[in-house]
Structure formats: C-alpha cells, structure tokens
Amino acid sequence: MDGATLAPAKVNLFLHVGPVDGDGYHPLASLVAFADLGDRLSVEPGEALALRVTGPFAAGLADEADNLVLRALRALGDVTGTGPPPLRVTLDKHLPLAAGLGGGSADAGAALRLARRALDLDLDDAALTQIAAGIGADGPMCLFARP
C-alpha cells in the first residue's frame, strides 16, 4: 500500500525558553497552531529505504543523507526489529529550511504515519509518539499536528 499526506507547518504563537536545567536542556513553554500548508510526503513500496527530495526548497536537503525523515524511519525499523523499512519516500519540500516552522519534525511525523499505514504495522499512537520524541522536542506535537 502507498499513500501521501501533508506535513503541516507549525506556527509558534508564543515561545518561552527557560534557563538550562540540571539535565542540560532548556525548559520550553509554547503555544502552537498548525497551518493548512506545508511539505507533502508520499511513500510507495521499494527494495530499500530511499528518499527523493523535490520542490522549491529541495536544494538544501538534496545531499543530506541523514535528515529527520530517514532518522525517523530508521528508528521505526529499530522499534519493529525489521530494520529500515523498504519504502521509497518522496518529500516535496515547500517549507523553507530552518525557518522555525517545524518542517523537519512535521516531515518525520508524516513519514512515520505513512510508513505505519503502508507497512500495516501493529503500532499504536503511543509507540509512534515515542519514536517522534527521539527525533526532537517538537516531534510528538508534529506527529499528529496537535499542540
């Protein structure tokens, strides 16, 4: 099975970054909303995990072999014990890189959702959320585009 989905842009309406705490991280307080625009991802069966990047902002990612989409899908393979999923992923990149719109995390979340469906994996939302959390601080909220 194959599929496609939107990876919506995350808009920070409010963001407060606190001082570094004991574990070396900054506590965050934020209020976000998700837009009706973003990147588009599609997956189809393949012989091995592969990523093709297209779109107006593809140039910044075209040579990046370890972007968040690939990291998320490799982590999914680790959790399932099957290794990297044999999927051909196309990322149609419409969000500018490093613009604070959560594009990479949204792309990773969309890839996880699509892979679960395409591979008919018996993983619940909590398991996907754990994988997304390992990708980045905004991974869980970008997974399902929910603040």
Predicted regions: what they are:
Residues 121-147:
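Alpha/beta catalytic cores of group-transfer enzymes, especially the acyltransferase/condensing modules
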Residues 105-118:
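Short, small-residue alpha-helix embedded
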Residues 1-99, 117, 121, 126:
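ATP-binding N-lobe of GHMP and related small-molecule kinases
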Residues 65, 107, 142:
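Catalytic-loop motifs flanking and including active-site residues across diverse enzymes
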